[in-house]
Amino acid sequence: MFNKILVVCVGNVCRSPTAERLLKRFHPSLTVASAGLGALVGKGADPAAASVASAHDLSLENHCARQISARLCREYDLILTMEKRHIAALCDIAPEMRGKVMLFGHWDSEREIPDPYRKSRDAFEAVYTLLERSARQWAQALNAEQGKP
């Protein structure tokens, strides 16, 4: 059973905080957090990510970027990454995590979700759409696992 989920990207200021909040929206009973492989530790959400999320009635307020660690990984049942290379990096940090690390876009044909950092608002909108779709798919899969419709 996956009750505690960690979402991981690079800086922990664009994709993973948005994905974290979307998963919480679609499956409120989960414990969801986020972290970065090269986190901009202590920073809030990227202003463009926050603006796009806000336009979709999703708040990234009070987000604070944090660095991934082996210890942090061990606290979660499932770790979701944005790119395949993130899975490899996490397995280097904590090899014992290999069986519980998957792509956030797993249910969307194993889709990798590109990094919009320092790109156009259109790039952030496109990434938001991918994140929202994948978050809905994860929520459905997790509900099915728990025997919920």
Swiss-Prot record:
It is an enzyme of class 3 (hydrolase). Gene3D superfamilies: 3.40.50.2300. Pathway: Glycan metabolism; exopolysaccharide biosynthesis. InterPro entries: LMW_PTPase, Ptyr_pPase, Ptyr_pPase_sf, Tyr_phospatase_low_mol_wt. GO terms for biological process: polysaccharide biosynthetic process. Its EC number is 3.1.3.48. It catalyses: O-phospho-L-tyrosyl-[protein] + H2O = L-tyrosyl-[protein] + phosphate. The active site is at C9 (nucleophile), R15, D115 (proton donor). Keywords: Exopolysaccharide synthesis, Hydrolase, Protein phosphatase. One of its GO terms (molecular function) is protein tyrosine phosphatase activity. Dephosphorylates Wzc. Required for the extracellular polysaccharide colanic acid synthesis. Probably involved in the export of colanic acid from the cell to medium. Involved in protection of cells against contact-dependent growth inhibition (CDI). Belongs to the low molecular weight phosphotyrosine protein phosphatase family. This is Low molecular weight protein-tyrosine-phosphatase Wzb.
